[in-house]
Swiss-Prot record:
Chief subcellular location: cytoplasm
Keyword Glycoprotein belongs to the record: no
Annotated EC: 6.1.1.14
Reactions performed catalytically: tRNA(Gly) + glycine + ATP = glycyl-tRNA(Gly) + AMP + diphosphate
TM spans (from-to): none
Protein species of origin: Haemophilus influenzae (strain PittEE)
Listed name of the protein: Glycine--tRNA ligase beta subunit
Keywords: Aminoacyl-tRNA synthetase, ATP-binding, Cytoplasm, Ligase, Nucleotide-binding, Protein biosynthesis
Length: 688
């Protein structure tokens, strides 16, 4: 079998940087899927992505599609011929569709009789004849939310397409993709290298593009180069570069030929909280800040240019000039904000609507203050500090800094509170109230901050559910899913003794008559338990384990987590499968019971297996009670796992539905007690 390397490059206008990597990997995945569907073998697929191009290279692609045989089964022989042995219309129609006569058909014997069959051979096509459609289909399936048209084209893509190059080895694959004919011409860097040049062989990519076009097409190569050079620049300046993965990938998507440079800003700006300076450097300018070994911001930053002049002075000075006004604004806002205390901004919260039916931000602040105090009492935090932090929780939204740099909310509240002389725990809580901000983010460190964070999240959840605006589909304008998961993480990971129903009831009471949904408590609790499912599935915990616990609907998150861990452990035991099956059988038997089931009567036991199980469950009922009270569900299930032998013996030797009513009721009582022991932890009958 002969093979060749295949290259396809789509040359475009500047692609959206935050979507570039996803587009490139999806393009490669789609090409791979199309090749597999076509039956074409290959060794490896490589993807390339730069601001003005997407490319895929297939290594050792078979140049010929294999032939294949397909079996077309026709009617049964009994239905294919009439009483005189002549073909029926059904048989003739089938044969005609296969391009044969009925006489040419073969026969195949099965356990359901004899059937007409035709084995047809489909010759494989040369790969080059298939590639245009393969690429077109792969591009059509890209995740493009808002495709665009350009010039007089009728086709749509994420950005205008200027060049298409498809090469199988050295052979140009002719065809048209997105309204552009395939050609050997590819474009180089917009400012460096050759503007256009021809590529003769797929093997020349991406090296030729770098040599002639001054473009590093390999996304990961550019990324690694930017990271290494940025770290080296920071080290030379006596610091460490703050390089977040998301920003690194965005910067990588903005440049074709990275030139990493360092610049500086005036030291006077360091009097402004570092978070505000970093916000504008990262968010607006896509710069990497530099910190010293103690975590203090240095008056330097790193940026990545898309051009590489011999003397970079002009570029460096240009970037310093661009960032200076933004830092000056931050300095002005900070100094202006310090003239008014946070607490004095409370009245202005009355002018800002939180939600039309739920009132203003001042209303929300009042509710957070009260609920944070209640939570603080339950978790052993300082109630007064929690209430004070709740009262001030949204005041920084009224500052100039947060109005201009929205992502600094919370952290600026902390800085302003410190300036105002507020207690340190209160100040820190103003920042940590929003934690966790995203998946994997850190949690509030103090119990005071945890109380405020939980109060804020439960207020939002209860309020929005209370007016019937639960999330639908992917729409979640109030970020309720994030709020629910964040609250669960705080309670579980800090092992807080809190109950969801209790918290929602207390939160709902603070809304007076604003809530219209009478089922708000159950709705919020069910929603949050549903988030548990997503959380544990992300951790790799089996769905049936989660369902086993959900069946009991425990509403204390820390308790819920302990049950999940216990059932997950139980599932690994040798006796788990048999006991799960036995519990399922017990559930079915008890569901058919036609009378109330009483307590076990040991003296009424007749069979040895019956008495053995009765004694075992009664002993275990006593032994597991203190463990249940301690929440040590793993130990409970470890003990109950010892019931496998007496349970198996019971079902092998005892007839539950005995004719004697007293005997039958006692055996049902044994099974009811057995089931009850497991249900104190979870419904293990749902385990698969």
């Amino acid at each position: 079998m002969t093979t060749q390397n295949f290259l396809v490059e789509i040359g475009t206008e500047e692609l959206p940087p935050k979507a570039l990597k996803t587009l490139a990997t999806s393009f490669a995945d789609n090409v791979e899927a199309e090749l597999i569907q076509a039956g074409l073998s290959f060794d490896k697929i490589e993807w390339f992505a730069a601001p003005r191009r997407l490319a895929v290279k297939v290594l050792n692609l078979a140049t010929q599609q294999p032939s294949k045989e397909i079996e077309k089964r026709g009617p049964a022989v009994s239905a294919a011929f009439d009483a005189e042995g002549k073909p029926t219309k059904a048989a003739e129609g089938w044969a005609r569709g296969c391009g044969i006569t009925v006489e040419q058909a073969e026969r195949i014997a099965t356990d359901k009789g004899e059937w007409l069959v035709h084995c047809a051979k489909i010759e494989g096509q040369p790969t080059k004849n298939l590639l245009n459609d393969i690429v077109a289909n792969a591009l059509a399936k890209l995740p493009i939310p808002k495709p665009m048209r350009w010039a007089d084209k009728t086709v749509q893509f994420i950005r205008p397409v200027h060049t298409v190059t498809m090469l199988l080895g050295d052979e140009l694959i002719e065809g048209e993709i997105l309204g552009v004919a395939s050609a050997r011409t590819i474009r180089g860097h917009r400012f460096l290298g050759e503007k256009e040049f021809e590529i003769q062989h797929a093997d020349q990519y991406p090296q030729l593009l770098r040599e002639k076009g001054s473009v590093v097409a390999d996304f990961n190569e550019r990324k690694a180069e930017i990271l290494a050079k940025s770290q080296a620049k920071a080290t030379a300046l006596g610091g460490v570069a703050d390089i977040e993965e998301s920003l690194l990938e965005e910067v990588t998507s903005l440049v074709e030929y990275p030139n990493v440079l360092a610049a500086k800003f005036e030291e006077r700006f360091l009097a402004v909280p570092a978070e505000a300076l970093v916000y504008t450097m990262k968010g607006d300018q896509k710069y990497f800040p530099i910190y010293d070994k103690d975590g203090k911001l240095l008056p330097h930053f790193i940026f990545v240019s898309n051009i590489n002049p011999e003397d970079p002075t002009a570029i460096i000075e240009g970037n310093e000039k661009v960032v200076r006004p933004r830092l000056t604004d931050a300095e002005f806002f900070f100094k202006t904000d310090l003239k008014q205390k946070l607490v004095d901004r409370l009245p202005r919260l009355e002018t800002v609507l939180f939600q039309q039916q739920l009132g203003t931000l001042k209303d929300k602040t009042d509710r957070i203050e009260q609920l944070a105090g209640e939570i603080a009492k339950q978790i052993g935090a300082d109630e007064a500090k929690a209430k004070r932090a709740g009262l001030l929780s949204k005041c920084d939204l009224m500052t100039n800094m947060v109005f201009e740099f929205t992502d600094t909310q919370g952290v600026m509240g902390m800085h302003y509170a410190r300036h105002d002389g507020e207690d340190e725990e209160v100040a820190v809580a103003l920042n940590e109230q929003y934690m966790p901000r995203f998946a994997g983010d850190e949690l509030p460190k103090s119990l005071v901050a945890s109380a405020v964070a939980l109060a804020d999240k439960f207020d939002t959840l209860t309020g929005i559910f209370g007016i019937g605006q639960a999330p639908k589909g992917s729409a979640d304008p109030f970020a309720l899913r994030r709020a629910a998961l964040g609250a669960l993480r705080i309670i579980v990971e800090k092992n807080l003794p809190l109950d969801l129903e209790d918290l929602v009831k207390k939160s709902a009471a603070l809304f007076s008559d604003k809530l219209t949904n009478k089922n708000v408590v159950a709705d919020v609790v069910d929603f949050m338990l549903g988030r548990f499912r997503a959380w544990y599935q992300d951790e790799g915990i089996a769905v049936d384990v989660i369902q086993a616990v959900l069946a009991r609907r425990p509403t204390r998150p820390a308790d819920f987590d302990a049950r999940v861990r216990a059932v997950s452990h139980f599932r690994t035991l040798d006796s788990a499968e048999a006991l799960a099956a036995a519990n399922k059988r017990v559930s079915n038997i008890l569901a058919k019971a036609d009378a109330a089931i009483g307590e076990i009567n040991l003296t009424a036991c007749v069979e040895p297996a019956e008495k053995a199980l009765a004694e075992a469950v009664l002993v275990l009922r006593t032994e597991v009670q203190p463990l249940i009270a301690q929440g040590d569900y793993t130990a409970v299930l470890d003990k109950l796992a010892n019931l496998r032998a007496p349970v198996d013996s019971f079902f092998d030797n005892v007839m539950v539905n005995a004719e004697d009513p007293a005997l039958r009721q006692n055996r049902l009582a044994i099974l009811n007690t057995l089931q009850g022991l497991f249900l104190q932890v979870a419904d293990i009958s749902v385990l698969q």
